Amino acid sequence: MMVRDKIDVGILNPFINDPYIEDISVDGVGPIFIEHKIFKGLKSVVGWDNTDELDNFVIKLAERTKRPITYRNPIVDATLPDGSRINIVYSTDISRKGSNFTIRKAMDDPISILKLIEFKTCDYTMAAYLWICIENGMSLFMSGETASGKTTSLNAMTTFIPPENKIVTIEDTPELQVPHKNWCREVSKGKGSGEGEGSDVTMFDLLKAALRQRPNQILVGEIRGVEGAVAFGAMQTGHPVLSTFHAASVEKLIQRLCGDPINIPKTYVDNLNLVVIQSAVKRPSGEMVRRMLSINELVGFNPETQGFSFVEMFHWDPVTDTFEFTGKGSSFLLENRIATMLGIPEHKKAGIYFEVEKRARILERLHKAGYTSFYDLYHMMTKVKKQGLLTIDIDAI
């Protein structure tokens, strides 16, 4: 029996147990709303008729997260026992229609990079490019606006991290699911933990601790505050960092990094190697889809112009709904960083693009063979690497 099936959440049980429901939201007194994988936003026929019943339910729900909710601490961000993420706002003093909450359900099998390709969030070549970059220790921010699928895409990329690596994940609420055996999962502890004053453990604290744990990669659920300075310090000392970030473009990302409350010195920003911009976009049919709008390499900071240089590697064309490798032949990371790390001679550095093509072909073959499950894909990619398929001729794949 799965953990999810052992959790009794009363009126919410049918929604929790339905694998096609992604989100559950209650805006106050009234019906429960859901986000369905097929039918999208729907209003249910059940809910609450008065604030007292709703408040009592919310109190019990918060108790299941071990973060009790009170008038003094009326907002809780936490995780249910099955791993689902929940946000609760308590009482009519703050939420005028009555207590409200939103549950983002945890998935038993996270979405794999091949599933993202099926959804047309990205394509094989983009995935192959990210694979070679992440495998070779590049730092990356998955950036976009709310509900753009940043965490889902970042999690899918963890299959590109070498299987022998030690990974530390740091989050406010645990969402990332890493397939590696050597994985240290850490979660911050703030107000509402029920342990009294002085018991807080922040993202900043966890990041500082992570640097002493000798990780090969550090994954941060989201960088939004002073922990950003520690993350960039980690990058500067050779610890690759992968994280999500709220910004709709590279320019806005840099503005946020250099402004309050993160305050990264401009000369530090290029320690970040890659910025992937992802968004939820509306197609002509009216369907909302998620697309990686661009993948960008941060090249450097020019002190004379006070500007940043970045090169767009991939670009999404909204007219054709396809992706273009705009940076082919001009990648700073591939030619000047990764090719050197792989021991490719100067006069043969153009061959690094052949390596990207080879990996794209491997992903396509794995897709056709049916390895779309997150964990199945990870184990198969581990097997591929152990058998040396990355070094053989592409025609033999």
Locations of the language-model features?
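Switch/coupling sub-region of P-loop NTPases
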Residues: 129, 134-143, 156-282
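Conserved lysine of the Walker
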Residues: 150
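Walker A (P-loop) phosphate-binding loop of P-loop NTPases
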Residues: 147
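Terminal-proximal interaction/regulatory segments of ATP-powered molecular machines
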Residues: 354-397
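Phosphate-interacting basic helix/loop segments used at nucleotide- and nucleic-acid interfaces
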Residues: 1-21, 72
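Conserved P-loop NTPase
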Residues: 274-364
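P-loop NTP-binding catalytic core
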Residues: 26-27, 31-139
